[in-house]
Amino acid sequence: MTGKKHEHIVKSIMPGSIAEELGIEPGDKLLSIDGQEIEDIFDYQFYVEDEEIVLLIEKQDGEQWELEIEKDADEQLGIEFGQGLMDEYRSCRNKCMFCFIDQMPEGMRDTLYFKDDDSRLSFLQGNYVTLTNMSDHDIERIIRYRLEPINISFQTTNPQLRCKMLHNRFAGDALKKVDRLFEGGIEMNGQIVLCKGENDGAELERSIKDLTAYIPLLRSVSVVPVGLTKFRDGLYHLEPFTKEDAKEVLSVIHKWQDRIYEQYGIHFIHAGDEWYLL
């Protein structure tokens, strides 16, 4: 468990639920279940599945209630919390040369500027994560709760190049976490955002070759061209791909698709639709 103290404020109670019967009210805090601090929604769902549980609730006046509950294994308590994840979203620690959010115009709604890099959102919403802020504790929970598939933004398997592209000196070492997930039997999907003159050409071939080592748990890898907008003042200089560039990229991908299909019976590496539209 992390050093952070987790107190989950009750937002609402379902009428006729176990929670209502026990006198739990909006504004109360859930402190623990069976003596275990609850980090997020995954801990909560795991512990409330038991037929016999003990809740520690702190009322709004500070009084703590220990509530012993007997219920059916699949019966919910009827508690809704203020945050769907029951925790803060984890933000990105990178400064990627290709970051699309950095290229957005001003004046849009605040949520569009939030850079998430949260493995839990990868499971819940299909978001891609870079692994740079994933701790050993996070990996253990992913394996324990089978939070799969995890969608990973690889960009490259060259550690030095990955550090450069993500502008994070830990980005290369973060690739070792893929081994942990693989050893834990976790299914994954991958993505490579291709930047002209950076991770294409021989580097793309290296990445595809390296990633085949994780088949069958790494189910697929998509290759997409970097998205560039006109709002790039002060950002890393990147050139857009041309039609001829797209032909070269597709040639590499199709070559590896044939090789991988012959060996594994799957295509594995896939080109984004954008390549065919250039």
Model-derived features: positions:
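Conserved Radical SAM active-site core
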Residues: 63-67, 71-217, 227-256
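Hard-cation-handling environments
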Residues: 240, 247-278
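Short, structured beta-strand/loop micro-motifs enriched in basic residues and often containing a Trp
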Residues: 6-15, 35-38
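Short, Lys/Arg- and Gly-enriched loop/turn segments at beta-strand edges
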Residues: 36-44, 63-66
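PDZ/PDZ-like peptide-tail recognition elements
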Residues: 1-8, 20, 46, 54-59, ...
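Conserved PDZ fold ligand-binding element
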Residues: 21-39
